[in-house]
Regions:
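P-loop NTPase motor domains
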Residues: 17-28, 35, 42-168
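P-loop NTPase nucleotide-binding module
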Residues: 1-13, 17
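Conserved catalytic segments around the Walker B and adjacent sensor/switch elements
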Residues: 10-12, 29-32
Length: 168
């Protein structure tokens, strides 16, 4: 109903692959996320088409801080120094993309990990070590540039193939 009465986009997070048939019938895009998938969505993709009041880099930095907080598993949240080293790394990895905004210049998680490691301080190393599972480990399918078109008005992320921990 929303798609018929508004120009809003609809994004579905589907933990049981229940919506795929409907989304396909409506001409939407189904993106299957799993370790075996050939569909990749780069968590570091940045949208430069924000209004003048919004800063895309600040919004992405906030997302990366939340992402790192989740993967580090701290019940008390990130320490102030950890937040600082993450923000510093985010600022650095987007410089090449902003200088030349082509898809191949979009940073990926290994770029973030390298920018953290290059800071040579324990807090940055701790965050980089937490990222290793997503860069070099069994969950490295997040360490790719986006290979699917997510510009469709109706997008369904099929996350059935993800483990229980990732579905959180």
């Amino acid at each position: 109903y929303v798609m018929l009465t508004t120009k809003d986009n609809v994004i579905i997070c589907d933990p049981e692959d229940e919506y795929s048939p409907l989304v396909n019938r409506l001409g939407g895009q189904v993106i299957r996320l799993s370790p075996n998938s050939r569909d990749y969505v780069n968590p570091l993709d940045i949208n430069l088409n924000y209004s003048e009041e919004e800063n895309p880099l600040a919004l992405k930095s906030d997302f990366v801080l939340s992402f790192c907080e989740l993967i580090m598993g701290s019940k008390t949240g990130l320490e102030a120094i950890e937040k600082t080293v993450i923000d510093r790394a985010v600022q650095k990895i987007y410089q090449p993309y902003f200088a030349d905004p082509r898809p191949e210049n979009m940073p990926i998680l290994s770029d973030l990990m390298a920018a953290l490691t290059a800071q040579h301080i324990p807090e940055a190393d701790r965050v980089a070590q937490a990222l290793d599972l997503y860069v070099n480990g069994s969950l490295n399918f997040f360490n790719h540039r986006t290979t699917v078109d997510i510009r469709n008005r109706l997008v369904c992320f099929d996350i059935k193939g993800l483990g229980k921990n990732l579905k959180k």
